[in-house]
Amino acid sequence: MKTFLRFAAITVGAAALLAVCGTYGASYYYTSQYGQGCASCHEMAAFVSVVHSAPHRTTGCMDCHEASLATKLRHMRIHIFGTVPETIRLRDVDVLAMTSSCKSCHQHEYANWHAGPHSATYTQIFADSTHNSKRMLMDDCLRCHGMYFGGAIGDLVQPLNTKGPWKVTRAGLGDESAMPCMACHQVHREGAQETRPDSRISVAGLAVQDSLAFYDRRETLHFAAASLGLPQLHDGARLVTVSQDPRQALCYQCHAPREPETGSLAATNEWGPQVGSGDDRTPMGVHEGIGCVACHNGHNENTRASCKTCHPQMSNCGIDVEKMDTTYADSKSAHNIHWVKCADCHQHGIPKVKTPAAAKAKLPTTPGING
C-alpha cells in the first residue's frame, strides 16, 4: 500500500512538474520569438506577417496582447472546434487592455491623450444629462464614441429617451475610455519605422503617418488616413479653401459638418455642407486653409501652437494677438478663433500698419515694463 501511495505521489508530482514546465516553457517560446510561435497557428500567420513589416516589428505579441491562461484556453477552443471567423477581430475588452500597454512605450502621447477629451469614459459621454435631454441617444453615436463596443446603443445605456436618468448598463465599462488609442491608430499595418513629423504649419499638407487610421465599426476595419477624402465646404455659396493636410481627413470622420437642413437657404440653393455646422470647426476668415493639427495636439485637442508661432506678438493695430477679443483669449467671446475675420472688428476698413513706436504709444503704461 505504501509503495502504491509513493508511486501515486511521484506520478502526480511528475505530472504537475511537467505541466508547470510545459506552461512556462511554451510561454517563454511564444514570448521570445517575436510572433513566430503565434504564427504557427494558421489563423495568426497573416497578422504576424504584416506586423513584421511594420514599425512594431521588434515588439513581441505579448507586449501588447493579453495572454492569460483563460485567453489561451479560449483561443485553443476556437482553434480546435473550428469556430474561427474569416477575419479575426479584437473584442472591446481586448482593445481596452491593449490601450494600457501603449503607454509602456508611448508615455508622452498616452499622457496627452489621458489628459484630454479623447479619453472620456462611457459614463462621461453616454450619461451626460445636458446632451441627452436635448438629443436622444442612437446607434450612430457609437461611430465615434464607442466604435469598439460590440452591441447596439440599447445594450450600453438606458433609458433611450430625453428624460433620464441615464446609466451605462454594461458592467465594468462605465469608467473605461470610449475612444481608445486604436480608434485612430492601426498597429498591424505595413510601413517604415516612423520619426517625429515636421512641426511646421502647412496648408498643402505633410506626409501622413502610417499608423493614422479611422476604425469603422460597421466594417470592423481600419481605413488609413491617407485614403480618406476631404469634404467640400461652403460659406454660403462660396467654396471654402480646406487644408489638404491628409491628417485632417481623420479629424473630419467625427468633427464633421452636417448636410443643410431642409428648407434652409443652403439646402434650397444646393450650396452643400456649411462651415461650422454640426461638429465642424474648419478654419475660415483669417485662418482659412490652415489644418487642425497646425494648432491642435491631436491627442488632447489642446493648442500646441500659440498665435505668436505665426504672428508677430503685436498686430497691425497695436494689440497683442493673444489678447484680442476671440475665443482664444476668452471662450465666451462672440468671435470664434476658427472663423474670425478682420471685418468682424474693423467694419469701417482695416487700419494701416502701425510702426512699433506707434503701437507702443497705444499701450497702457506699466512701470518697469513699457514706461
List PLM regions with ranges:
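Short sequence/structural segments immediately N-terminal
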Residues: M1-G371
